[in-house]
Structure formats: C-alpha cells, structure tokens
C-alpha cells in the first residue's frame, strides 16, 4: 500500500492481524492476469445505467426484495465455468498467507465480485430512493441477469458478519489501480475488539484528527480507532475481520 503522510502509521503485517483486525498482504498476484480479469468482468458485468430498471414503476412491477445478490452456490458470476480464478486460489503466496491466517484446512466460504457504482451511473430515481440509506445495496434495482455480482454506492462503515461467533476473514482483491478517491476500502483498525454491534454503528469522527474515530458498542464500552484507506494496484490483497 503506498505510504501517505496523512495516514496513521500502523504496522499492517500479517503477524499483527489479531491486534489490528486487518492486514495488508500486498501485490502478490500477477498484475497482467488481474487486469485481464478486470477487463473480462467489465465486459460481462458493466457499470452503467443500462443495468438498472428504468423507473420506480418498472421496479415495483418486476423487481424483488429477496435473493438479489450473489449466492454461495448459485447465481454467482464467479461460479461460471468460463471463470478461471486459479491465478488467485492457486497462487503460492496467497495460499501461504491464508494458511498463516486461517490454518492449513482453510476453505473459501464465499467469493463474489463487488462493483462500486459512481453517481453518474445511478439513475436519478434510484439515487433519490437510496439517498438516506447508509449501505445502499443497488442489486434490488439491477436487472436479474446482472445480479450475480454485487453493486454498491457510497457504502457506510459496516461489519461483515453472519452470526455473533463468526470465524471468517474477508479478503479483498483489487483488480486495477485503486487510489484514495477511487472507492478505496476504509477500515477502522482494531474495531473488531468491540465484537459484533448493530448497524448503524455508534461512531463519531474526531474534531482534531480526521483519521480518528470514537466508537461505542452502546453498552458502555468505548474505544478510539484509526482509519486507514486501502490503496494499491492490480493484484493487491488486503484482509480484515
């Protein structure tokens, strides 16, 4: 991850994952293969206004509020036979990092493409519909054929979890160059120590330090967290819990 004088100085090496709740694995994947796969995804699952229902009326007539996101075993672009992820899953450095993190018997619980949708691509009626939603999942408003990837727009701080005792790690792979202002992942270091809390989370930004947040679990426990912005090139990997 490129160094930035404005970011907190945090050692994001894998050995510090238990304390930080996140780690930078680095640009360990083949850059050309990562970029080529990004082009393949962009061709098959583009980001533009043509993937969305054209009006609220069309959505209410044809859309749904369930089963609209990529599944573990079906309706998932990455499960298509023409998709080859061996450049990731069989990469020796990736395998070693996952074994160090999760043990030799680790399994990939779920994999999915996440696409960040810029404002210009979101139809006005949808933008108005979700403007007060902190985690605007756009998939309900996307035609069925495109719902096998995940589309988000301006996502708020949240936790990846399925249950209170969740024991998985989320692994992010960048397929192209991601700068700080290009929908980069933002993480509150150490916030995992508070455990699972409900959304929207009790967060307040410091008035003195733009990259520091005050976090509460709403039961009397409080902590301060540094925010990091995860930038990197094609083939870069970052993980968090």
Model-inferred region functions:
Residues 3-6, 178-241:
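Double-stranded beta-helix
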Residues 81-87, 157-160, 216-229:
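Active-site rim elements
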Residues 1-19, 26-157:
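Non-heme Fe(II)-dependent double-stranded beta-helix
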Residues 29-31, 114-119, 162, 177-180, ...:
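Short, solvent-exposed loop/turn segments at secondary-structure junctions
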